[in-house]
A protein has these predicted regions:
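Short, aromatic/His-centered strand-loop micro-motif at the edge of beta-sheets
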Residues: 119-141
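Extracellular carbohydrate-recognition regions
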Residues: 13-41
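Flexible glycan-contacting loops in extracellular carbohydrate-active proteins
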Residues: 163-193
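Structural motif
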Residues: 3-12
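Secretory/extracellular carbohydrate-interaction modules
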Residues: 50-121
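Short strand-turn-strand beta-turns centered on an Asx-Gly dipeptide
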Residues: 154-158
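Short tryptophan-centered beta-strand motifs in secreted/extracellular beta-sheet-rich domains
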Residues: 27, 81-83, 135-146, 151-153
Length: 193
């Protein structure tokens, strides 16, 4: 027997390639993760996803992986997304929020960093939106325009920043929350052992 991890999956059927309606989820209405049939969950032993009252909770102590939740939405060129966000700490960890096309290519990313910054990636650089406090709830509203390649972020009703998309996409079809940076290594050009 190999020492590799063994993965077991539960995939709801029928599998849907396209969403019929935009997300309008209130997590307080759910008692169990199995009820989140419109969400794709990547929950690990050391990076679990759970429900706690009105919150969908992502935790992470895994050095090599992350927790991830993703919601498929209808293909949209002008999108408004709103959610409440609270971090339990601001001195460790990373939360990334990405807006993706049908192929999983992100056009925009928001991050809560281990430096206590809430920032947005625009082009090749990041722009700081605000310093976030642990235990404080933030009402975040994000407006994305595929035609203008722009994202505008509002926090608690105030404009926090505007950034250009870092990748052009034909439409936005997914919203994703992840507790770590996307893995891009190894690549096809990585030398063999």
């Amino acid at each position: 027997v190999n020492k590799e991890d063994m993965w077991v999956s539960h995939i709801p059927v029928p599998v849907r390639a396209h969403a019929s309606a935009h997300a309008d989820d209130n997590f307080a209405n759910y008692k169990d993760l199995n009820e989140l049939t419109d969400w794709n969950l990547y929950s690990l032993q050391w990076a679990p996803v759970s429900l706690d009252g009105k919150w969908l909770v992502l935790q992470d102590k895994d050095l090599f992986d992350y927790a991830r939740v993703e919601r498929k939405i209808p293909a949209t060129k002008e999108l408004k997304v709103s959610f409440e966000l609270m971090a339990e700490q601001n001195d460790k960890g990373l939360l990334q929020i990405e807006f993706l096309d049908e192929n999983g290519i992100a056009c925009s990313r928001l991050e809560l960093t281990s430096d206590g910054l809430f920032r947005a990636k625009g082009g090749a650089r990041f722009g700081n939106l605000l310093k976030y406090e642990p235990g404080k709830t933030y009402k975040v509203e994000v407006e994305l325009s595929v035609a203008n390649r722009m994202v505008t972020v509002y926090v608690d009703g105030k404009k926090a920043g505007q950034r250009m998309f870092f990748a052009p996409v034909p439409a936005i079809e997914r919203v994703m929350f992840r507790t770590g940076a996307q893995r891009t290594y190894p690549t096809v050009d990585t030398p063999a052992d």
